Amino acid sequence: MSRSDPGSGTMNQHLVVCGINYHFTPLAIREQFCIPDSCIGHALEALKRFPHIKESAILSTCNRTEVYAVVDDVRGGMADIEAFFASVQHVSDHEILKPNFKLLRDDVVLHLLRVAAGLDSMVLGEDRIMAQVKSAHQTALERQAAGPLLDFIFKLALSCGKKVRTETSMGRRAVSVSSAALELARTRLGSLAEKSVVVLGIGKMGQICVKHLLSEGGSGAVVLLNRNQERITAFLKSKLNNK
């Protein structure tokens, strides 16, 4: 198959996406599916071993963990992706934690375009998602998991996302869940300079929120609360090492 022609040889190839996202799944469950950036490459290698998966890419953020794939059989490919998710979960109850988001063919392309454009984000126009989609694309190429079809639709999505941000009002200022939360707090409470701020949870969004607070010097004491104390310790050590 020629890389310059994603449509060649696709008679028995089907585009699918399968996973979980914030529309259907609460945060506590999304955390069980989350694949750290450092593990994405290994996860792609695992996907290669499934018989029906011919191409794959993984987009894993705070709000979604989605496997984009080209499969030679829809039912078999979806079963392979579900088996993959069962193998990477951090708990054993696979009946409760099955992926509940699935799309086929053209709907996959439309979904990825919306994601990259920030139209499917928890905060409309979220700016970080473009970098996350780009990273998912690059890692899939580097691991030789993405072939011509996924390469094509990811490039299309990134181009669309860039165009939306340059030609509409969504690109006028940086937007994320963390920045929106801080903006809302300042709107309701006024200046945070003399106030203690409690950050509940030290996942990706919590860490970004803390970094915003520290870099801007925009609050008094910052208190971190998390179910896992070791995660707070690791985050604080990384902050100290980066100084």
Kindly label every feature range from the protein language model.
Residues 95-192:
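Glycine/serine-rich phosphate-binding loop and adjoining beta1-alpha1 elements at the start
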Residues 2-3, 9-121:
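A glycine-rich (often HGG/GG-containing) alpha/beta subdomain
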Residues 53, 91, 163, 219, ...:
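A general structural signal for well-ordered secondary-structure junctions
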Residues 45, 83, 110, 131-134, ...:
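Solvent-exposed alpha-helical segments within well-ordered globular domains of core cellular machineries
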